[in-house]
């Protein structure tokens, strides 16, 4: 039962694909919308579960923070972080949040434009906290040259070849993942030469 107007449009089959939602950059408030479009192909991966503690006068209050990446290995990826008293609820919540945060990934070529686009269209950087992640296009067949954390995210995004470099305290997994996600989501906010408007000389 959809709650938002967007959910109703999806239910009545007014919206054909997720791309239409991204085109008008509408906020997706319901994870069911994502399930509806990508249901079968979605895979999720728990990146990390870490205990976080709050000091109370009776000792510590331990909760679990779960980082979950979700993607369909074909141009959509999301990242969710959820804190909860139990591990299971944290993971479940993180998966829902990851679905809500799913972004389209723009893929391009390295050099000649043959076959399917396989890498990032241009060098992009994303940052979160002190962590800075830079994604650099790579020739076909390179694979993802990266640390384990961004590698999972990039694989889920459906990027086959990519060089990465990371600066800062990449041991903070949350920020490392967020910075990677930030970089991936920036692929569409870049204006690349092939999107330039034709200049009309007057």
Curated annotation (Swiss-Prot):
Biological process annotations from GO: translation
Family: Belongs to the universal ribosomal protein uS5 family.
Gene that produces this protein: RPS2
Alphabetical list of Pfam families matching this protein: Ribosomal_S5 (PF00333), Ribosomal_S5_C (PF03719)
GO MF, any single term: RNA binding
Positions carrying Phosphothreonine: 192
Keyword terms: Cytoplasm, Nucleus, Phosphoprotein, Ribonucleoprotein, Ribosomal protein, Ubl conjugation
Organism of derivation: Cricetulus griseus
Main localization, broad class: cytoplasm
Subunit structure: Component of the small ribosomal subunit. Interacts with zinc finger protein ZNF277 (via zinc-finger domains); the interaction is direct; the interaction is extra-ribosomal. Interaction with ZNF277 competes with the binding of RPS2 to protein arginine methyltransferase PRMT3.
Transmembrane segments: none
Presence of keyword Phosphoprotein: yes
Protein's cellular compartments: Cytoplasm; Nucleus, Nucleolus
Record's comment on post-translational modification: Citrullinated by PADI4 in the Arg/Gly-rich region. Asymmetric arginine dimethylation by PRMT3 occurs at multiple sites in the Arg/Gly-rich region.
Function (record text): Component of the ribosome, a large ribonucleoprotein complex responsible for the synthesis of proteins in the cell. The small ribosomal subunit (SSU) binds messenger RNAs (mRNAs) and translates the encoded message by selecting cognate aminoacyl-transfer RNA (tRNA) molecules. The large subunit (LSU) contains the ribosomal catalytic site termed the peptidyl transferase center (PTC), which catalyzes the formation of peptide bonds, thereby polymerizing the amino acids delivered by tRNAs into a polypeptide chain.
GO cellular component: cytosolic small ribosomal subunit; nucleolus
SUPFAM superfamilies associated with the record: dsRNA-binding domain-like, Ribosomal protein S5 domain 2-like
S5 DRBM domain: residues covered: 42-105
PANTHER family for the chain: RIBOSOMAL S SUBUNIT (PTHR13718), SMALL RIBOSOMAL SUBUNIT PROTEIN US5 (PTHR13718:SF93)
Name of this protein: Small ribosomal subunit protein uS5
């Amino acid at each position: 039962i959809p709650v938002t107007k967007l959910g109703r449009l999806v239910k009545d089959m007014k919206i054909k694909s997720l791309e239409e939602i991204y085109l008008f950059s509408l906020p997706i408030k319901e994870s069911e919308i994502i399930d509806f479009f990508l249901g079968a192909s979605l895979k999720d991966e728990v990146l990390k579960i870490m205990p976080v503690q709050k000091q109370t006068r009776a000792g510590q209050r331990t909760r679990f923070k779960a980082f979950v990446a979700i993607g369909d290995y074909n141009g959509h990826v999301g990242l969710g972080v959820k804190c909860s008293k139990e591990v299971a609820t944290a993971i479940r919540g993180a998966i829902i949040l990851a679905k809500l945060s799913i972004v389209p990934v723009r893929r391009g070529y390295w050099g000649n434009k043959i076959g399917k686009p396989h890498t990032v269209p241009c060098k992009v950087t994303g940052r979160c906290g002190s962590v800075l992640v830079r994604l650099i296009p790579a020739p076909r067949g390179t694979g993802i040259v990266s640390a384990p954390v961004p590698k999972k995210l990039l694989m889920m995004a459906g990027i086959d070849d990519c060089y990465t470099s990371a600066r800062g305290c990449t041991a903070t997994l949350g920020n490392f993942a967020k910075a990677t996600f930030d970089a991936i989501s920036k692929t569409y906010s870049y204006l690349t030469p092939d999107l330039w408007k034709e200049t009309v000389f007057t």
